[in-house]
Amino acid sequence: MTMARRLSPVFKGLSTVTLAALLAVGCSSKSDGGNQSLNKGSGDVPKGYTSPIPDELMTPDSVKTSAGTFNFFDGMPDAVTAKASFDNLKFIRAYETFLTLMPAASIEMLRAGHASQGVTDHTKVMLMAPLNSNPLFLTGNTDTVYGSTFFNLKNTGPLVIEIPAGLGPGTINDAFFRFVADTGAPGPDKGKGGKYLILGPDDKEPENTDGYFVFRSPSYSNWLILRAFLDDEGKPDQAVANYKKGLRLYPLSQKDDPPAMTFIQGGEGVFNTVHANNFHFFEELDTVIQREPINLLDPELRGLASSIGLEKGKPFAPSAQERELLEEAVQVGVAYVRADMGKPRNPEVYFYEGKQWFTPFGGGSYEWLIDGGKGGRNLDARNNFFWGYTVNTPAMVLKMEGVGSQYGVVATDSTGAYLDGSKTYK
């Protein structure tokens, strides 16, 4: 039987065998008048064909899905189906972009919040001595004396950080919230203080690095967050004095004449450091993509971002319809991460069977690896962490008595009901 089919230009130049295979996969079960049913076995020859076609290769004329009803003729979608499938794909990619690249937007808003208070370069440090409820931080502790700043290695070149002795745990994270280095007790200075030399992605390592703890960051923008503690009387004065006396950041090129430091009290300021949970999330993310080196993200992640219009060197200008779709994707993502963060589905994160307390580091890894990496990355645990918490360091995961720190989280009472701020719990 001779079959006439509408062939797209994409088929030109294909061999007869290849063309036949493509047609077999694409054709619907009703390709010849719409009267025959799906073939029942892989050895059957459907009407209109000359060769057996397995059932699983056939496309029905109409398919009902959660994304809508898709209609096909000879395996080719009609205009409504094509548009719906493309819109659904963009929604999926926007949803995945929100979850997967959330760490970048989170740390970017930390940087922006600091900048709004005058912490605009490495010579300015925000002291939170201590922190009250005015500044919006995800996991700021009110009994910790923080020293916090951002530095840009593209502007400074190799940067020296002088850490004073006696500080608690400190951490450097890159612009994708990845771990770069620990300082203080869990770091190589072991709480005795020392000089750290941070190299950027474009920097060559100096010939002489004697006297420095050397680390390299894959990003230009980096966050230095340091912790000190209240004294026995609950006062921050001693910690503040230690910061002001010993904390220094300066380019290696200025080591012989370091610039003066400015310390800004930010513990009571009114400002925000939390990423948006609406369309503006993508604008925050675009700031990172435009500023940072191309290799901050691997090609797979860059492709995910560019599929919704976020590409280095190009303006992010979604249409009104695209903007609406991106907004919806964020809202669906927020619903998921709120649900799993408050009541994680992974039983392994709970400290005790049948209890509510859990760790934010699923898998016992600051990289959220499953079985040491055999199972890849625990995406739920990673998403939960960066939506609700900040600072990424192995010192918050590994059992380092007297040096690191461990965190437990609870969001529900003994019955599994969410905690209510208007109630008292024992």
Protein language model annotation of sequence segments:
Residues S28-S31:
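Bacterial signal peptide processing site
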Residues Q36-K426:
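A compositional/structural signature for long, glycine/proline-rich flexible linkers
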Residues L23-G26:
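C-terminal motif of bacterial Sec signal peptides marking the signal peptidase cleavage site
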Residues V17-T18, F91:
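Hydrophobic alpha-helical segments
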Residues M3-V17:
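Bacterial N-terminal signal peptides that target proteins for export
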